Swiss-Prot record:
HAMAP family per record: UPF0213 (MF_01029)
PANTHER family named in the record: UPF0213 PROTEIN YHBQ
Gene transcribed to yield this protein: yhbQ
Coiled-coil ranges (or none): none
Stated name of the protein: UPF0213 protein YhbQ
Gene3D superfamilies in alphabetical order: GIY-YIG endonuclease
Pfam family, one: GIY-YIG
Entry superkingdom: Bacteria
Organism: Salmonella arizonae (strain ATCC BAA-731 / CDC346-86 / RSK2980)
Residue span(s) of domain GIY-YIG: 2-77
Family classification: Belongs to the UPF0213 family.
Amino acid sequence: MTPWYLYLIRTADNALYTGITTDVARRYRQHQTGKGAKALRGKGELTLAFAAQVGDRSLALRIEYRIKQLTKRQKERLVTEQEAFESLLSSLQTPVLKND
C-alpha cells in the first residue's frame, strides 16, 4: 500500500494551501511550476510549510477536508506544534476492529 501525505504550502502573501499526495517532492515541484492546483497559480514564491505521512488515501482525504475547515490561526498551530497535528490525526483515525 502506498503511503499518503498531507502537506501545507505557504504562498507569498502568507496564505496556507492544504493538499494530499503520495509524493510530496513531486507535488511541490508541480505547484512551483504552475502545473499543480489552480489556487496556487500566480501566488508568488511558494514554500513547503508542513508535510506528514498520514496513512491511506481515505484517511488523507478526511484529514485534508478537516484542515480546510480550520481557521488560519488553527492551521498555523498545526505547522508550529507537532502535538496539535497529532491530536487532529488521532481524532480522525478509525479504530481497527478485530474479528475473534
